């Protein structure tokens, strides 16, 4: 979940990861290097995925009824963000194996990537017809309801999922998202603390807790959570990006610029980091009456817009 706050004509963006990362999809012209960065793979790993795609395509050509091959193709296409192809392969899997829960779950997640929430919910309800107590189905139905603004319905699904699986920290993060959207920040904090109690190494929970603290004006507490997230994953670009905003809020623009450059070094295609760096440059420029810094700020905003347009 991304939050954007306009200040002095600059976009201030702070990240609260809730469900899935904001990936690009078909139609996006990305270099292999940029694609690798987007999906967290190396270029050599992408080449291995391509080899597997070729191999499984050969399998389905030889045997169109090979449900497992179609399923594996769906997984590989999903990894490459070829979502239309992934949808097609998962649908073929379901035709061949009508009781396949895993194919339906994966299909629903791809629908969500394409903002096809109605289709996602419909597919997940098919899962519940097969297995009424499927935790993932309740979680992901809740996620689609949340994404479409059906907060009470989302809350009901997440609570049902939690009844079925009390030790799933992710569900607490989902509940936090709903409570945050309802303005129930104390409840949001409570859910994130429960997630961290279950899994102290859950970096997303620390990131989101930092986000809620930031919204509450508790800057020191927010910084502490971001530092914990980075301690868990030193390459967690979102945490560096959010940390930069805390520095901006404290008027520590040099520190903000330094940490935001670190975020971009880790993930050059993270939109929020570019937006936030532009925000830091802009505010430092206003403070120092520096036209060159304003140019740097606008360049970062241009990069940000290009990246958002590519998603």
Predicted regions and their residues:
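Helix-start (N-cap) detector for alpha-helical repeat units in TPR-like alpha-solenoids
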Residues: 67-68, 101-102, 135-136, 169-170, ...
């Amino acid at each position: 979940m991304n939050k954007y706050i306009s200040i002095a004509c600059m976009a201030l963006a702070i990240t609260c990861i809730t469900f899935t990362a904001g990936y690009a999809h078909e139609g996006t012209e990305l270099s292999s290097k940029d694609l690798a960065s987007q999906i967290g793979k190396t270029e050599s790993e992408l080449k291995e995925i391509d080899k597997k795609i070729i191999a499984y395509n050969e399998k389905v050509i030889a045997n169109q009824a090979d449900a497992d091959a179609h399923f594996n193709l769906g997984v590989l296409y999903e990894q490459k963000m070829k979502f239309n192809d992934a949808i097609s392969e998962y649908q073929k899997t379901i035709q061949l194996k009508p009781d396949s829960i895993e194919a339906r779950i994966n299909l629903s997640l791809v629908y969500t990537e394409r903002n096809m929430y109605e289709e996602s919910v419909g597919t997940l309800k098919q899962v519940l017809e097969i297995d009424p107590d499927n935790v993932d189905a309740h979680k992901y139905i809740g996620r689609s309801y949340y994404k479409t603004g059906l907060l009470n319905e989302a809350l009901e699904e997440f609570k049902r999922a939690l009844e079925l699986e009390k030790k799933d920290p992710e569900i607490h993060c989902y509940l936090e998202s709903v409570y945050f959207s309802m303005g129930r920040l104390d409840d949001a904090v409570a859910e994130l603390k429960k997630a961290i109690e279950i899994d102290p190494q859950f970096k997303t929970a620390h990131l989101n807790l930092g986000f809620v603290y930031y919204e509450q004006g508790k800057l020191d507490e927010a910084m502490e959570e971001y530092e914990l997230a980075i301690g868990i994953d030193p390459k967690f670009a979102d945490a560096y990006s959010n940390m930069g905003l805390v520095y901006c809020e404290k008027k520590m623009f040099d520190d903000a610029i330094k940490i935001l450059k670190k975020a971009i070094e880790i993930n050059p295609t993270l939109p929020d980091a570019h937006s936030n760096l532009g925000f830091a440059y802009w505010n430092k420029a206003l403070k120092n009456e520096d036209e060159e810094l304003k140019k740097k700020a606008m360049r970062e905003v241009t990069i940000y817009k290009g990246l958002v347009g590519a998603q």
